[in-house]
Amino acid sequence: MFEIDQRARRLTDKEKDQYSKKGYVTGIPVFSENAVQDLHNWYDELSSKLPNDIDINKTNMWHKASKKFYDLSRTPAILDYVEDLIGPNFVQWGGQFFSKEPKDGSVVPWHQDAQYWPLSPANAVTVWLAIFDT
């Protein structure tokens, strides 16, 4: 569906250790530059088709509303990274766009998502795919 970056791989022990200690890992390759542009274009196209009263960023469960989003969330490279962090038995709980376009002025303070979720134990992973260069 979307071209995988040739650098996609399993997480290193160092990355898994960082996740265990700090709760995050960054800079993990998933999609090629062409695929990122395709994702950006798809986001723009989808946004333009929504009614004005629907904010694409405040709508959850896109994996249930869009086959393309569903397939995106099941990209093997992404699932491998999640498995490296929490093991092979997991489910997708949500699916949401979170667009913070360059120079839009919005601020998201540092936080860990698990404190906002009704999950117990809080053994969860957020996968954030950056498609905008902020």
Predicted segments, located by residue:
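Non-heme Fe(II)-dependent double-stranded beta-helix
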Residues: 1-22, 26-119
